[in-house]
Structures are given as C-alpha cells and as structure tokens.
Amino acid sequence: MSLNLTDAADDRSYKEMEKYTVERVAGQGTFGTVQLARDKSTGSLVAIKKVIQDPRFKNRELQIMQHLARLRHPNIVMLKNYFYTVGGEGRRNDVYLNVVMEFVPETLHRTCRNYYRRMTNPPLILVKVFMFQLLRSIACLHIPVINICHRDIKPHNVLVDEQTGELKLCDFGSAKRLAADEPNVAYICSRYYRAPELIFGNQFYTTAVDIWSVGCIFAEMLLGEPIFCGENTSGQLREIVKILGKPTKEELHKLNGSSTEINANAKATPWENVFKQPLPAEVYDLCGKIFKYVPDQRITPLDALCHPFFNELREPTTKLPSGNPLPAHLYQFTPDEVEAMTEAQREYLLKK
C-alpha cells in the first residue's frame, strides 16, 4: 500500500519528536541507527530506532510492533511511540521512521561476551532465566491467532538486564505473519542461527525456524561460541551435520533438500561430547529435543517451558547471581498464552 511519507512527517510527528532529548547513538547497522533518548515528561530513558522508509510501502515492522504492543507481553520489547522525520545524514528528501521503544540496558550478545572475555560462561541459573523468557517470547509470537515468525533471533536482538534478570525480544525488521499456502523468502536469519530448512532454500517454512535459533543461543551461552559456525551456507550445513549426523532420506525429503554436499559417513555427536565441560543431563535432553532436522519434530516453545531444565526456577529460594530475586513475571502468563496451552501445559505451568 502506498503511503505519502512526506505528508506523514507532519506537525504531529514534529510534536512527537520534541518529546525526546537524544543523548547518544547506542547502535548502528545496515538497518539504520538506534539512539538513546530521554522522555522529557517522565525523565525515563527510551530507545529510538531510526530507519529509512520506502515510500511505496507501509512499514511491516511498525505494524507488527503495534499489534504486539496490544498484547503487553513482558518478554517482547514495548512500542511506546513512533514518528516520521525528513532528511538527515546528507539525504535531504529521505523520510525516516523513528520507532520509540522501552529502554533495556544491554543485549544478550554483549552480556555473554563480557563472560567469554573472562574465559568463563554465564552462570547456569542466568541461562535458565534468560532461556525461559526467550521461549516465552516466541511462544507468544507463535500462538496460532498471531502466527508471527521473528526470522532473525540472535543474541544481538535479545535485550537483557543482568541485575534484574529481565529479557525482551526486539528487532522485528524481519518478522512476518506466516500463511501456510504462501511462499516466503528463504534467505533470512543470520547464518549461525539459520534452521536447516532455510539453508536448503525451502520457502514454505513454519515458525519452527525460531525455535532452532533459540536453541542456537542456548548452546552458545553454554559453549562460549556459536554451536554451528560455518563460513558460508554450505559450511553452515556441514557444521550442523557434524553434530546431528547425516539426515535420513525422509528428513531430506521433508526439508526439500539434497545430499550432494553432505558427508555420507557423518554420524551424530553425543551431546556430552559437544560441550567443553560436563553439564546437567537436562541440558543434553533439551538440545536433543530442539535440534531436529524436521521442523515439526522440534519441541514447541510451550512444551520447552515445561522441560525439567527449568525446574530450579520454580523454587521460591532461587536467586539471580546478583542476589536479586527472579523476575516476578516469570510464571505470570497472559490470557493469550493460557488460551494457547494444552491442558497438561496449564496444569504444569500455572500450578506454581
């Protein structure tokens, strides 16, 4: 749908823009810039993502964020406001969309990197707290009536506060509501976090690509480096095969893939041998349930929330490494989440 964006950058937008004082640039990339700003009326910090807007289309990211904002999910970054601006950075006639979001101090990428630099990994309790909330975020996105696939889950797109243990999924620039009979672009998602069906170019994928990406983050937090670290697309597939073994003919058929670039003798590596140090058996079990070649064989986000790996989060004495209590909202599910649960999931997750 066409949109007259020059008109959109009108008086209302200028009034909205005046509500914030930009303090510094917090991030920059091919998508645009993220600015740290302060709301003049409340004094609270916000993040403003500024992206150039194609005048031919409405911004899908904004539409998705507006929809998600109505759900008020604690693990999805909240859209606070938006406005358009014209010009800037030597491009006088370009129109920019400015998306105002709640501020969260760090990305999971930077938080984990601070541990890796000290030759250690995040404490297991922190992995549990962050993973539980990340799974909740995609469980919400994947509810059938919503059916949004994020398509670019990686540590850079996960916001965290290590002191409070809170986590919020962000950056919905690649997100899309999937329809079963509609093809989608397969060259999506950052390579290290890309599911096998995407590597094979399958255009009729499902939201199960997100659970694969979440699994990659899970393993990375425990390994100190990406679990599948290919230099290119074919190299990425080889790294997956090294750990999962060669897919069967049936699995390849379901992936719409071929075996031409796969080592015919590759056998699965036991999860105990994948990680550098001994870990609880529940870690290996959860990895085995996430990392399946066939998308509909992967554990669902709601089932993953019921996995024994997270049992420690249910204990009232459990605390964060900071000494603070666990986030209060961990088991406070929204009506939409409860509606999407099976009876067994409700029985387990709501009885805490």
Curated annotation (Swiss-Prot):
Q: Where is the Protein kinase domain?
A: 20-310
The record's Gene3D superfamilies line, in alphabetical order, gives:
Phosphorylase Kinase, domain 1, Transferase(Phosphotransferase) domain 1
Q: Which residues form the active site?
A: 152
Any one biological process term the GO annotation gives: signal transduction
Which keywords label this protein? ATP-binding, Kinase, Nucleotide-binding, Serine/threonine-protein kinase, Transferase
Where does the chain bind ATP? 26-34, 49
The family note in this entry says: Belongs to the protein kinase superfamily. CMGC Ser/Thr protein kinase family. GSK-3 subfamily.
tRNA-binding among the record's keywords? no
Q: Identify the SUPFAM superfamilies for this entry.
A: Protein kinase-like (PK-like)
Protein name per UniProt: Glycogen synthase kinase 3
What's an example GO cellular component term for this entry?
A: ciliary plasm
Q: Which reaction does it catalyse?
A: L-seryl-[tau protein] + ATP = O-phospho-L-seryl-[tau protein] + ADP + H(+); L-threonyl-[tau protein] + ATP = O-phospho-L-threonyl-[tau protein] + ADP + H(+)
